[in-house]
Curated annotation (Swiss-Prot):
Name the UniProt record assigns to this protein: 7-cyano-7-deazaguanine synthase
Domain of life: Bacteria
Gene that produces this protein: queC
Species name: Desulforudis audaxviator (strain MP104C)
Sequence positions that bind Zn(2+): 191, 199, 202, 205
EC number: 6.3.4.20
Length: 220
């Protein structure tokens, strides 16, 4: 069986790539550039991870998303910087989720990947969803996966399906899985910003740092 990985270069998608190369034939890694602040770092991380596993890498340009988007991820708003104690606060988490929400991003990316998958004869699209963020990002949820697969049954002739090896895991469990898979941590970029070093204070950095400690002090 052949598959395509939606690869941002971050924790979840990197672990899905590491798992995917052991589970099926990965034909392509796709990275989206929609004008996000971390686009350059994400593309570089995804390219390095793809090269590490010997997989072809391609960048898909989606400039219109930045033109219509008012998300903090594209710089239209200031990035939220929640304290670690706020990560499990449902009100604060819902607020930060709204700030970084990109309209229909995962729905769009899955369908772009489906075009490539069908053209390349791939049966699976691998995406890095997770249980922790599904609480406030519906496009990480099992319901989203079921719905998009129902749609793909009609929009593709070959019955392509989206799978995620991390969807039932929280961030600490994903870090632990990455450790078991021998993920090259130095190649991963999870920060919402695109500086020389991870900022350490955006929500993505906070969640990764907490996950590392929960997984036993993993050095990522």
């Amino acid at each position: 069986m052949k598959g395509i990985v939606l690869l941002s270069g971050g924790l979840d998608s990197a672990v899905c790539l590491a798992f995917g190369v052991r589970s099926l034939e990965v034909a392509l890694c796709l990275t989206a550039d929609y004008g996000q602040l971390a686009a350059g770092r994400e593309i570089a991380a995804a390219a390095a991870l793809s090269a590490h596993y010997g997989i072809r890498h391609q960048v898909v340009e989606l400039p219109f998303l930045r033109e219509i988007d008012c998300s903090a991820l594209t710089g239209r708003l200031g990035l939220p910087e929640p304290e670690e104690m706020e990560l499990d606060d449902p009100v604060r988490s819902a607020e930060t989720a709204r700030q970084v929400w990109v309209p229909n991003r995962n729905g769009l990316l899955v369908n772009v990947a489906a075009c490539y998958a069908e053209a390349l004869g791939c049966e699976r699209i691998i995406a890095g969803f997770n249980r922790e963020e599904a609480q406030h990002f519906p496009d990480n949820s099992p319901q989203f996966l079921d719905a998009v697969n129902h749609s793909l049954a009609y929009s593709t002739l070959s019955g392509i399906r989206v799978i995620s090896y991390t969807q039932q895991l929280d961030k600490a469990e994903i870090v632990a899985l990455g450790q078991r898979l021998g993920l090259p941590w130095s190649l991963v970029w999870s920060c919402y910003r695109g500086g020389d070093e991870a900022c350490g204070v955006c929500e993505s950095c906070r969640r990764l740092e907490r996950a590392k400690r929960s997984a036993g002090g993993v050095r990522v």
